[in-house]
UniProtKB/Swiss-Prot annotation:
Transmembrane regions listed in the UniProt entry: 54-74
Annotated source species: Mus musculus (Mouse)
PROSITE patterns with a match to the protein in the record: C_TYPE_LECTIN_2
Gene this protein is translated from: Clec2i
Protein name: C-type lectin domain family 2 member I
Compartments, as annotated in UniProt: Cell membrane
Pfam families assigned: Lectin_C (PF00059)
């Protein structure tokens, strides 16, 4: 510890820099008892915060920063998932059921193929079209025990099956019978003449882009 070199000075040391301050001795004289000055003394002022504590504080700040970033990413992911859910399940209007990118309507009474197609067109749809096995399985299960007209037809037994928009059927499931109009039974696709009354199924692409809303922040 540094010593004061001058009498009457009181030394305070901070960061190893010495400072001397005069401090008279208490007494009756102007400078203390008998006019004497107390010999200077040195004191060291030491910071109360240790480097270890500072490092701990830095560590806590870093951990909190990482936690905030992780939370922001999680909230952003949740927001994206909510938008996707709205697209998948909130797209179809009342009495229509959504699967994938389509909406399906199942009739409540039987009519012939021509009437069924006209009804679907009035709803801005067509007699049902399926493009994959998942959609076909859904239609078979959801229609119940009824045979239902779908959107496949052909000009004759010598011609290929087509959908109502005139695109050819890919024969992913064979169509039984010699009729010109197809219907869906419980476990197969069959054909018959158009005038027979059956239930029917309409389908159309969903319009989720018009209904999708971003959740509030």
């Amino acid at each position: 510890m540094p010593d004061c070199l001058e009498t009457g000075e009181k030394l305070f040391v901070h960061n190893m820099n010495a400072q001397c301050v005069q401090k008279p001795e208490e007494g009756n004289g102007p400078l203390g008892t008998g006019g004497k000055i107390v010999q200077g003394k040195c004191f060291r002022i030491i910071s109360t915060v240790s480097p270890v504590k500072l490092y701990c504080c830095y560590g806590v700040i870093m951990v909190l920063t990482v936690a905030v970033i992780a939370l922001s990413v999680a909230l952003s992911t949740k927001k994206t998932e909510q938008i996707i859910i709205n697209k998948t399940y909130a797209a179809c209007s009342k009495n229509w059921t959504g699967v994938g990118n389509k909406c399906f309507y199942f009739s409540g009474y039987p009519r012939n193929w021509t009437f069924a197609q006209a009804f679907c067109m009035a709803q801005e749809a067509q007699l049902a079209r399926f493009d994959n096995e998942e959609e076909l399985i859904f239609l078979k299960r959801f229609k119940g025990d009824f045979d239902c007209w779908i959107g496949l037809h052909r000009e004759s037994s010598e011609h290929p099956w087509k959908w109502t928009n005139n695109t050819e059927y890919n024969n992913m499931n064979p169509i039984l019978g010699v009729g010109r109009y197809a219907y869906l039974s419980s476990d197969r696709i069959s054909s018959s003449r158009s005038y027979i009354n059956r239930m029917w199924i309409c389908s159309k692409l969903n319009n989720y882009n018009l209904h999708c809303q971003t959740p509030p922040v």
